[in-house]
């Protein structure tokens, strides 16, 4: 009985440690999109490994939101695969096609710490990926790389 109890406690400690480790690399951030009267919530996939998985972009309308209730009116969302951890989410002016883009950056788990980024634009009822870059140096200008990717995409049409 003593051995059984010890094994059970060890297993519980392992599970608790593993659950805590999964939370150490979680990411959740709310980003205001005032010109659209929206707010976006970017979060990494729950219970996924730190180094790979997914993240979600959920968009809510704030057009009729009371103070403190800006995530009540869900509009749309997308899931995106990730290679690395989500590092940040912010808005950036990426030019005429994406004047208030939602940018999500990731950092690889490997020794290089390479950076990736995706840019999204929203409409009243949709969120759309407009540019994506991967394998950037850790100190790269993410906004410039996304602007360049947008330009290449435009010239390919």
Task: Locate predicted features.
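Exposed acidic/polar residues on beta-strands and adjacent loops within beta-sheet cores, strongest
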Residues: 20-157
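Bacterial N-terminal signal peptides that target proteins for export
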Residues: 1-8
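N-terminal signal peptide c-region/cleavage motif recognized by signal peptidases
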Residues: 16-18
């Amino acid at each position: 009985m003593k051995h059984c109890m010890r094994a059970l406690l060890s297993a519980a400690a392992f599970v608790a440690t593993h659950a805590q480790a999964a939370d150490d690399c979680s990411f959740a951030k709310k980003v205001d999109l005032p010109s659209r009267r929206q707010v976006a919530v970017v979060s990494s996939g729950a219970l996924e490994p730190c180094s790979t998985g997914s993240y979600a972009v959920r968009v809510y309308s704030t057009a009729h939101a009371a103070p403190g209730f800006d995530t009540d009116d869900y509009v749309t969302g997308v899931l995106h695969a990730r290679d690395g951890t989500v590092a940040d989410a912010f808005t950036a002016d990426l030019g005429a096609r994406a004047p208030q883009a939602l940018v999500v950056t990731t950092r690889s788990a490997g020794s290089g710490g390479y950076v990736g980024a995706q840019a999204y634009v929203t409409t009243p009822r949709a969120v759309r990926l407009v540019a994506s870059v991967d394998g950037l140096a850790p100190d790269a200008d993410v906004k410039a790389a996304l602007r360049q990717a947008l330009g290449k995409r435009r010239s390919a049409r």
